[in-house]
């Protein structure tokens, strides 16, 4: 495949956009490009990136695990998009909060803040009570803080991307399925579809089989006192024990592709997810209860032209998502094009946003080389 695409990735490494990455491109159901570039880590030792490197997917957890789990529970008649959050949590039975539904959470229109540093309270408690960090009590404390959080907009009034909403969705999955989120996803998604290298890592419980595997390094974290590798980068997810609805999933580029293909095939009616629901989740939502200008589907984003990270050419029939660690998915259903970009752009520091310019340029180049625009 195009040497121009390889050159672009090599330029990204050389320019310091990211230490390394893995790019996978599929067109018309065929993987056309799958290549590793640069380094999986720079410190304490430089280690080359490989195609089977395991990445912290960050917010790709939202569509690939949490939204998929919600969809499965809906198609099994255990949930409905119109279910109010008050059905599961008494904290949402008062005021404007009683208007929040699962639909609002999936669509990032519930009116919840984007992020709060709950982990700081957990870290302080850890100093007094060693072992508290990552415990079930720590997770419960963070979830309670989320439930008590004041709304910053009326449900349905504004589009506000929110980790907090997906923390709550993870809790809904666990309440309805009566099992932890990681176990539900393993049983109903990952193991069923031969994704043996897609998993959450619970603090102190990394599976023996993965202890010798290559993980892409993320940040040199000041409060953890080390370079993070093989443990979740997201501070709140880490404080919650490594498993949360907004972050915590690890995988390879190949298995991310398999999970994305599962959505693609389901939309076409040939996959395991309900076709109508899969189409709904991956389509930009419109209507009276949807904020004007929102690009969100349900758990998935769609191109927000003219400044989408997908670039200039992905059609309105596209869906995708970004992850803070430097990961992204973009899928064009119209052209049967899938682009998986996994990088470690936060290594060794998150103070690097060059990928914001790099992503759309890369996607435009891929379109030129693969689709021929």
Label every PLM stretch briefly.
Residues 10-12, 54, 287, 314-319, ...:
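Short, P/G- and charge-enriched loop/turn segments at secondary-structure junctions
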Residues 329, 336-345:
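Short, well-ordered beta-strand elements
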């Amino acid at each position: 495949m195009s040497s121009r695409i390889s050159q672009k990735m090599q330029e990204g490494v050389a320019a310091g956009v990211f230490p390394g990455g893995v790019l996978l491109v599929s067109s018309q159901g065929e993987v056309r490009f799958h290549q590793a570039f640069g380094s999986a880590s720079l410190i304490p030792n430089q280690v080359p990136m490989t195609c089977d490197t395991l990445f912290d997917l960050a917010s790709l957890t939202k569509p690939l695990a949490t939204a998929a789990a919600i969809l499965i529970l809906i198609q099994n008649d255990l949930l409905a998009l119109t279910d109010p959050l008050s059905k599961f949590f008494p904290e949402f039975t008062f005021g404007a909060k009683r208007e929040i539904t699962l639909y609002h959470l999936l669509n990032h229109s519930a009116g919840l803040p984007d992020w709060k540093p709950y982990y700081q309270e957990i870290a302080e408690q850890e100093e007094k009570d060693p072992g508290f960090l990552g415990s079930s009590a720590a997770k419960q404390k963070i979830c309670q803080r989320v439930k008590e959080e004041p709304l910053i907009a009326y449900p349905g009034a504004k589009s506000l991307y929110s980790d907090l909403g997906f923390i709550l969705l993870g809790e809904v999955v666990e309440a309805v399925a009566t099992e932890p989120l990681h176990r539900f996803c393993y049983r109903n998604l990952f193991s069923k579809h031969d994704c043996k290298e897609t998993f959450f890592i619970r603090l102190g419980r990394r599976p023996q089989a993965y202890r010798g595997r290559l993980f892409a390094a993320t940040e040199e974290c000041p409060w953890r006192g080390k370079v993070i590798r093989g443990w979740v980068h997201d501070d709140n997810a880490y404080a919650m024990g490594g498993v949360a609805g907004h972050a915590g999933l690890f995988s390879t580029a190949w298995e991310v592709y398999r999970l994305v293909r599962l959505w693609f095939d389901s939309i076409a009616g040939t996959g395991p997810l309900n076709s109508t629901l899969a189409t709904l989740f991956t389509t930009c939502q419109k209507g009276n209860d949807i904020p004007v200008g929102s690009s969100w589907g349900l758990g998935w984003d769609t191109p927000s032209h003219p400044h989408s990270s997908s670039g200039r050419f992905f059609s309105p029939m596209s869906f995708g998502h970004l992850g803070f660690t430097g990961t992204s998915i973009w899928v064009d259903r119209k052209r049967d094009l899938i682009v998986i970009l996994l990088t470690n752009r936060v290594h060794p520091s998150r103070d690097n946003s060059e990928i914001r310019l790099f992503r759309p340029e890369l996607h435009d180049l891929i379109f030129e080389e693969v689709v021929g625009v």
